[in-house]
Amino acid sequence: MMNAGDTGFMLICTAFVFFMTPGLAFFYGGLVRRKNVVNTMMACGAIMGLSVVMWTLFGYSLAFGGNHGGIIGDFRWFALNGVGWEPGPYADTIPHLVFVAFQMMFAMITPALITGAVVGRMRFKALFFFIAIWSLIVYYPMAHMVWGDGGFLATIGSVDFAGGNVVHISSGVSALVLAIYLGQRRGYAKATYRTHNIPFVFLGAAMLWFGWFGFNAGSALKADGLAAHAFMTSSISSACALLTWMLIEVIREGKPTLVGASTGLVIGLVAITPGAGFVPVWASFIIGILVSPICYFTVILLKQKLKSDDALDAFGCHGIGGIWGGIATGLFGKTSINSVAKWDGLVFGDHRLFLAQVLSIVITIAVAIVGTLICIGIVRIFTPLRVDPKEELVGLDASQHGENAYPSFNGFD
């Protein structure tokens, strides 16, 4: 039965999640060199438009309409045909259109996360085409497998409350693959890349934290106790990760940094995303405290071993954070909190949820790697992915967009 309170709540949560993509633009934009800030923020802006058009035309239908082999949907809701004001099959107290809009914001933020790995060296048109194809090949199937009716990963007993697999692991792994393919930025081994605008970084992180309440609490799909539970676990995990990252910096560097604190709060949110509506409140303390050292030292190790240039650590934050979050859900999940989970977690004496979580993570990684390689192969048929050395040296703001984030005016502007 339709519920006005649930509908209002979900519309607000949808707007919250939308707010995350501009927040990501500020977060990433502040981290890059000033000659690439327009390009970095423009990538998020372009995805905001592209994702809405693709989702409403065919993305939603492929992710949530019908079922083919537990992997993909069909075209029954092409251009939202048959999607109206009445409740749909996935939420019985809100209009079907509201559910579509809420999920659309997930389809927006997810590919935007990838852009942090390739800043300063990928052609804008190549990135645009890559994101379009990636959404089709990776995101829509992942959304169906986890959340769609008859989805394969849901069938094996895996749970993902708000997008550990669908959003963070898929985008993080894809970001790493793309970064390895593109190669390092010019002078990467010699130069020290400075964060050009620290206030932007903190502003973006704060916008992300604000929007994440809609992201996680809204995944309850109604204004109830589960939404409140997800709200609190998200707050706690983020806060603990922030403080733990600061502590690591104090121990290793002698002083905390605002960039580090901002990074910590974001990875705390990443880690709690899959389990926000499944784990007890006390477990969110553990999840948040542990994700910071896990991500901090994994990033250092990976950069030493792989020599990869994941510029803004998209894999280190979202890939590793999402993997830990998925495993933690298998450790601490409880059916008494959310009956969508078929079994309790490993710490409560049942190994089945934990095994399902590990299997789903492995499958997600495989889908992301293979899908990203396919996307790269298709895009390179039409355009080189990497900019020319001269364009990279000048900066992508000027070479790709003809704009400067901080112009120097002579006379009146």
Residue spans of the language-model regions?
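Glycine- and aromatic-enriched membrane alpha-helices
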Residues: M1-D413
